[in-house]
């Protein structure tokens, strides 16, 4: 699915039982859940930092562009992350 097909007004929230945090022992961001832990790569960690249940996907993209520059791939990277995170049941999109 590309950016044009994805509703950028959806607001991502971490699902109950899932917690996003920086883990010093892993030297990176992780998602903790009752059955274990998922270590995120650097770009996934950067996106995850902006999932707060308040901002929609469009606002998250805007903040990442402000932080990293107007890189054209950011839009699609964020959409891809949201789709994978939803499929893996890490987040809800409302």
Swiss-Prot record:
UniProt keyword Ion transport, yes or no: no
Pathway(s) it belongs to: Cofactor biosynthesis; pyrroloquinoline quinone biosynthesis
GO MF terms, alphabetically ordered: quinone binding
Protein's GO biological process: pyrroloquinoline quinone biosynthetic process
InterPro entries: PQQD, PqqD_bac, PqqD_sf
Keywords attached to this entry: PQQ biosynthesis
Gene3D superfamilies (alphabetical): Coenzyme PQQ synthesis protein D (PqqD)
Superkingdom: Bacteria
Family recorded in the similarity comment: Belongs to the PqqD family.
Subunit structure: Monomer. Interacts with PqqE.
Known role: Functions as a PqqA binding protein and presents PqqA to PqqE, in the pyrroloquinoline quinone (PQQ) biosynthetic pathway.
Record-given protein name: PqqA binding protein
UniProt lineage: Bacteria, Pseudomonadati, Pseudomonadota, Gammaproteobacteria, Moraxellales
Gene that encodes it: pqqD
């Amino acid at each position: 699915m590309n950016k044009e097909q994805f509703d950028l007004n959806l607001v991502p929230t971490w699902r109950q039982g899932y917690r996003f945090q920086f883990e010093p022992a892993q030297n990176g961001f992780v998602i903790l859940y009752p059955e274990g832990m998922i270590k995120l790569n650097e770009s996934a960690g950067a996106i995850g930092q902006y999932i707060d249940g308040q901002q929609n996907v469009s606002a998250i993209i805007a903040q990442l562009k402000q932080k990293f520059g107007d890189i054209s791939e950011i839009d699609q990277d964020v959409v891809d992350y949201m789709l994978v995170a939803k499929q893996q049941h890490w987040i809800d999109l409302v």
